[in-house]
């Protein structure tokens, strides 16, 4: 099989992957795996300013289910919105009460996992980044809102991203786009910002012609093509770009910068790179949420305690319907290594959506692990005129 509509392939990356991933030739060459890879080399100048060179392998707009990777743009949009509102006493640590004004909505007034005992945008984002919490994503999406999300994404240049679903499964179809009243309260329980029940005003079209993937069982031996046009849409290229902008926002020209404060950026980076065991609020049981819980790159399916303190993976992952996605900024402070890497692979041999029978551990995660190490090994050997100063990132994890 040949790839269709996949024009973006770098000869250099093609050669590197085929030379280093000889055990995964099928995943690289067979279109049924829908493999995409985006790798960014980073070269610093004498003032530590970065320059980027992107290499792509089979990068396309073809539909892939982004799963939990949408938590990155949802979190980013929430922080941008808070800063734009610029209301007194309103910030990510302000108590956020979610009300209920529609049949599938839930009133949320407490959060035992937060330091204050109350829900906050900050604690929800921590839970998304640390353990990929779907309920936290739903609450933050409700604050952001369908219309604001797509208007702001369009302003930022991400015209194709679609955030239609909240991931918690509570509100089906278009009802997911109807967001409940949200109240922010100060320490005296006075309302500092109130957002009413909000209906979406525009039904957005899906940006690609076909979003059908696999088949859906509808009866005994009866299947239909699975249409994802009502689901979230986020290409690996756009995801990679968002991660790059967050990591390097302070280094970008003014016209390319995200409208995000550096303090909010550093907050995002800290929890993208943190292990669950390092978090105090929220706190996680180490046996359940092990170090490599959401670190597909470098660690694959291993249930590992990470001892390589010099390496940090700032990342977001997705896993559903046979799709595996990881998007990361990977650094090694000891060896002065840094690079950006995003990849998706589809490991659903029967091509049946919702079967629960996927080759994550047998094929997908080992591939992502090997892929990331092949890039790491290449970066370790690659000569650079100036070594990067990565102190800004290492200091995020100092006590």
Residue ranges and their predicted role:
Residues 3-178:
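Active-site-adjacent loops and short helices of periplasmic peptidoglycan-processing enzymes
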Residues 5, 35, 41, 185-186, ...:
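Intrinsically disordered, low-complexity regions enriched in small/polar residues
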Residues 6-25, 29, 217, 221-399:
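Structured C-terminal helix/loop/strand segments within mature extracytoplasmic catalytic/sensor domains
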Residues 37-39, 96-98, 153, 163, ...:
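Generic structural hydrophobic/aromatic packing signal, biased to beta-strands
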Residues 50-55, 92-96, 107, 193-200, ...:
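Short low-complexity stretches enriched in small and charged residues
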Residues 54-67, 71, 192-194, 318-331:
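Generic detector of contiguous secondary-structure segments
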Residues 61-66, 81-82, 122-123, 155, ...:
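Glycine-rich loops and low-complexity Gly/Arg-rich segments
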Residues 117, 131-257, 263-264:
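Mid-domain, small-residue-enriched loop/turn segments at the edges of structured enzyme/sensor domains
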């Amino acid at each position: 099989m040949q790839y269709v509509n996949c024009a973006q392939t770098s000869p250099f990356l093609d050669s590197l992957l085929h030379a280093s991933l000889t055990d995964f030739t099928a995943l690289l060459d067979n279109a049924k795996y829908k493999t995409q890879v985006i790798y960014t080399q980073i070269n610093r100048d004498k003032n530590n300013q970065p320059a980027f060179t992107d290499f792509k392998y089979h990068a396309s707009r073809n539909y892939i289910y982004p799963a939990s990777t949408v938590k990155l743009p949802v979190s980013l949009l929430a922080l941008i919105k808070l800063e734009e509102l610029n209301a007194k006493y309103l910030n990510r640590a302000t108590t956020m009460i979610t009300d209920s004004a529609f049949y599938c909505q839930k009133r949320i007034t407490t959060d035992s996992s937060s330091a204050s005992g109350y829900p906050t945008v900050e604690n929800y984002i921590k839970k998304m980044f640390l353990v990929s919490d779907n309920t936290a994503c739903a609450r933050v999406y409700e604050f952001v809102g369908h219309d604001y999300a797509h208007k702001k994404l369009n302003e930022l240049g991400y015209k194709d991203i679609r955030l239609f679903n909240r991931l918690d499964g509570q509100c089906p179809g278009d009802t997911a786009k109807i967001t409940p009243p949200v109240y922010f309260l100060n320490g005296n329980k006075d309302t500092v910002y109130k957002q009413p029940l909000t209906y979406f005003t525009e039904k957005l079209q899906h940006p690609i012609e076909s979003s059908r993937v696999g088949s859906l069982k509808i009866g005994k031996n009866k299947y239909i093509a699975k249409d994802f046009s009502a689901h979230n849409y986020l290409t690996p290229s756009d995801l990679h770009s968002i991660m790059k902008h967050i990591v390097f926002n302070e280094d970008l020209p003014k016209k390319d910068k995200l409208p995000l404060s550096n303090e909010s950026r550093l907050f995002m980076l800290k929890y993208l790179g943190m292990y669950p065991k390092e978090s105090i609020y929220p706190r996680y049981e180490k046996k359940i949420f092990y170090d490599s819980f959401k670190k597909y790159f470098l660690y694959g399916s291993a249930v590992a305690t990470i001892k390589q303190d010099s390496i940090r993976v700032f990342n977001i992952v997705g896993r559903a319907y046979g799709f595996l996605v990881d998007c990361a900024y990977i650094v090694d402070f000891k060896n002065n290594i840094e690079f950006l890497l995003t990849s998706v692979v589809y490991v659903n041999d029967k091509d049946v959506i919702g079967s629960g029978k996927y080759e994550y551990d047998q094929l997908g995660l080992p591939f992502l692990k090997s892929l990331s190490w092949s890039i790491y090994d290449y970066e370790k050997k690659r000569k650079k005129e100036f070594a990067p100063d990565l102190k800004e990132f290492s200091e995020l994890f100092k006590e």
